[in-house]
């Protein structure tokens, strides 16, 4: 599995602000979008381009254009919605495929409850977004679902990843790419990432 921890100063600064205990919902939401955008920039750096000729203000000119790669953004509900707009800033024509999976707080196991996927997944690059990669259970279940529907090319974007989740994801899906803003220390007994961000979904949606 390709693992990239994006260490750009802007990413580190924005993530540091997100860790503040008293951050408000508006700021947390804005920063999730901004880091999602920066991770997308990194994750799409290998997209192939081709030369095409267009009519410019000064006549025909040859330009670079992304070569026929269709994209679907896959936010894992609900927290993944907080990163979705950051991806769409760069690929505004992407289809949106939604997967609903929540983590049982007692067993820490993923529980699927909703899916609405693009019809031609086998032809698309899937960019899966979720702020936290903790145990990896929800992400693994999502990727299992995408692959069962024919998706062959998957990149995962998360804000914060725990070593335990990275290990589990690599064991289950060694062929995918994972981009994160930080690899944090560990999971606590409740399955939360330390130091982490707290409950990212609650902070994005202003709920408790």
From Swiss-Prot:
GO biological process: UMP salvage; uracil salvage
Binding-site list for uracil: 193, 198-200
An example Gene Ontology molecular-function term: GTP binding
Superkingdom of source: Bacteria
PANTHER family on file: ADENINE PHOSPHORIBOSYLTRANSFERASE, URACIL PHOSPHORIBOSYLTRANSFERASE, CHLOROPLASTIC
EC number of this enzyme: 2.4.2.9
Name of the protein in question: Uracil phosphoribosyltransferase
Cofactor(s) of this protein: Mg(2+)
Residues binding 5-phospho-alpha-D-ribose 1-diphosphate: 78, 103, 130-138, 199
Pfam families cross-referenced by the UniProt entry: UPRTase
Keywords: Allosteric enzyme, Glycosyltransferase, GTP-binding, Magnesium, Nucleotide-binding, Transferase
Enzyme class: transferase
Reactions mediated catalytically: UMP + diphosphate = 5-phospho-alpha-D-ribose 1-diphosphate + uracil
Activity regulation description: Allosterically activated by GTP.
InterPro entries to which the protein is assigned, alphabetical: PRibTrfase_dom, PRTase-like, Upp_B, UPRTase/APRTase, Ura_phspho_trans
Family to which the UniProt record says this protein belongs: Belongs to the UPRTase family.
Cofactor mode of binding and number, as noted: Binds 1 Mg(2+) ion per subunit. The magnesium is bound as Mg-PRPP.
The species this protein was found in: Haemophilus influenzae (strain 86-028NP)
Keyword field contains GTP-binding: yes
HAMAP family (alphabetical): Upp_B
Keyword Ribonucleoprotein: no
Task performed by this protein: Catalyzes the conversion of uracil and 5-phospho-alpha-D-ribose 1-diphosphate (PRPP) to UMP and diphosphate.
């Amino acid at each position: 599995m390709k693992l990239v921890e994006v260490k750009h100063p802007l990413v580190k600064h924005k993530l540091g602000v997100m860790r503040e205990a008293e951050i408000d919902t508006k700021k947390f939401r804005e920063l999730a979008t901004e880091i999602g955008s920066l991770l997308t920039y990194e994750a799409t750096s290998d997209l192939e381009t081709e030369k095409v000729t267009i009519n410019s203000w000064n006549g025909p000119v040859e330009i670079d254009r992304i070569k026929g790669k269709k994209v679907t953004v896959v936010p894992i509900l609900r927290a993944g919605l907080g990163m979705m707009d950051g991806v769409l800033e760069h690929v505004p024509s992407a289809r949106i495929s939604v997967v609903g999976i929540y983590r049982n707080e007692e067993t820490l196991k993923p529980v699927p409850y909703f899916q609405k996927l693009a019809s031609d997944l086998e032809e698309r690059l899937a960019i899966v977004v979720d702020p936290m990669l903790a145990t990896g259970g929800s992400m693994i279940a999502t990727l299992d679902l995408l692959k069962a529907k024919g998706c062959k090319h998957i990149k995962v974007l998360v804000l914060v990843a725990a070593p335990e989740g990275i290990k589990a994801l690599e064991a289950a899906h060694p062929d995918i790419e994972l981009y994160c803003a930080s690899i944090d220390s560990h999971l606590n007994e409740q399955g939360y990432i330390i130091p982490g961000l707290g409950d990212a979904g609650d902070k994005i949606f202003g709920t408790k």
